[in-house]
Amino acid sequence: MNIGIDATCWWNNRGFGRFTRGLLTALFELDTHHHYTLFTDQPMADVSRFSHVTVIEVHSSRPTTEAAVADSNRSPFDMLRLYRAVAGAPLDIMYFPAVYSWFPAPLKLPTVVTVHDAIAEHYPKLIFSSWRSRFFWTLKIKLAIWNSDRILTMSEAAKEEIVEYIGARAESIDIASEAPNPLFRRTTDQVLIAAARARRPTRSGTHYCLRWRTRAA
């Protein structure tokens, strides 16, 4: 099977990019029976070690990670170029790891899109700075749902909100829980623990989950 994947949010520094990088890297390492075709709008060398992965770089006026942000939107011509690239590839299915970077796919091609939650729809006043940004986000979400055969999300609670606030059909939503990145791990290094406690005063005997950033060796 030849599986097409939107990888234009690979360089996103927030959750969308982290999820995409973690999921695809693990998938390519575990599954060598299928061929994967990635569609990007930037040079991508991170997956060159995988012989069963092909990267198709599509020219764009601005990378998705710059264009798909608050108070901005992607060029229709850039999305058309991505559509044509997907339409011209011999794919069996198309997958979008994040609705954030979604673009139209051919209607005849089975498509799956990940919708992580409905926070933007539930609390729009906290997310959008203008009616314009809210309008384009809502339009993209509605088109992505309509264009997809299946929707992937991460929890039953997220599924319920996607149904309630976005209007997706419950029977079209599948749930797959997320695994932590190997970088997140329990430490027994007492020096790090003491330093973390010094930065964030804690009470003795109480358990905490702390995010601690260390330099790579």
Q: Which positions does each model-derived feature cover?
A:
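Carbohydrate transferase catalytic cores enriched for Leloir-type hexosyltransferases
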Residues: 1-217
